[in-house]
Amino acid sequence: LTTKIGKCFVGKGGGQRSLSEQGKKLALKRARLVAAAENKLEVLREEIEPYTNNDHILIYCGAAQMLDEGQDRTVSSNGDTRQISQVVNMLGNDLGMTISKFTSEEDIKERSILKSEFSLGNLQALAAIKCLDEGVNIPSIRTAFMLASTTNPKEYIQRRGRLLRKSEGKEYAEIFDFVTLPFSTNTAAGQTIDDVRGVYTLVNNEVARGMEFARHALNFADATDVLDDIRESFKLDELKLMLQLSGQDFEEQPWA
């Protein structure tokens, strides 16, 4: 998809380029695939295992369908499983945690009960879709695993703000923001600038969001070390300079 998107740029005045309508559709399709990347579940299992006896945990899921590796589709079918269902099954059945979905499928009364049980610690975790974007207040959240991310600064700053809301006994919140890369940093480090140029916007947007989260974090140094490794491996600084010198500025495109 990234290669196809790279072929959909059209010229504008002043040497600028923008995506065609077809390119924008492909970019949205790629965004959904990023949101539902299969290996996010594997990483979630590793990261959440130390928290299986904790409570007040939010897993923020994508609305996209889970796709097996190699599949290039985003339409629903009977063979697809929503990411949130995979999460609930893994935490509830595999890890023995008490967890419930928190989505638009639950009515206002059900949501109210879930929020109450969650706040009391009777329900360890909530797996949610879009709740941080819909004005839902759950200030008792202490740990959040963000499987679904956005490249819109306004949205991810708003989501962070909702997670950091004050609650009795809550001094801070732990936020795990899952960064999705097209391939590993080791692979990227061994490639040329031309090889990684096609994924510049995708990776740069992920790093930019990570840096925004990191700059106010207590573990700023550790977080920025990880992001700097990504930046260096994918040659983001060199690519940014090349794009600027050629009059292109892909990273400012809101659809990327």
Predicted regions located by residue number:
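Compositionally biased, intrinsically disordered low-complexity regions
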Residues: C8, G13-G15, T192, E212, ...
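Conserved RecA-like P-loop NTPase helicase motor core
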Residues: G92-A221
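The feature captures the C-terminal accessory region of ATP-dependent helicases
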Residues: D237-A256
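Conserved helicase/translocase motor-coupling segment
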Residues: T2-E117
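A conserved mid-domain beta-alpha-beta active-site/ligand-binding segment of alpha/beta enzyme cores
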Residues: D222-S233
